[in-house]
């Protein structure tokens, strides 16, 4: 019975939290399985601008991809929709992977998660030229 009470209290706390207003920047980190028999890791910096009903902005940073090892620059346009404590997000753009052919690859993902104010935690799935991406993202508002 005690476990159920703690679980109910945790769920009530998460649902009662309200997302924080848009901050100046957002620092994100993600890890994903890429069906091209690789893993993709990113650290990005983004800026979301408030528009009626949603937020839109760029997200650019550093990417590391395994098998074979390659570094690059992900450059995406992000659309973010806050729904209370939850969020839905989509992004699309180009990834520049310098030691792979082709160097410029189309990228698009969508996902969702919990917006806990300064921290957002979520999952995402999508496409990076020649394969699917399935992963998780954590973001910090700065």
Annotate each PLM feature.
Residues 28, 112-117, 131-142:
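Outer-membrane beta-barrel "beta-signal"
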Residues 20-72:
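Short glycine/proline- and aromatic-enriched beta-strand/turn motifs that initiate or cap beta-hairpins
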Residues 1-26:
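Cleavable N-terminal export/targeting peptides
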Residues 34, 48-50, 82, 127-130:
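Short polar/acidic secondary-structure junctions
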Residues 45-53, 78-85, 116-118, 140-142:
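Outer-membrane beta-barrel proteins
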Residues 27-31, 58-60, 75, 88-92, ...:
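Membrane-embedded beta-strand positions of outer-membrane beta-barrel proteins
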Residues 30-34, 61-65, 80-82, 91-99, ...:
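Short glycine-rich beta-strand segments
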Residues 37-43, 54, 69-75, 86, ...:
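Residues that define the transmembrane beta-barrel architecture of outer-membrane proteins
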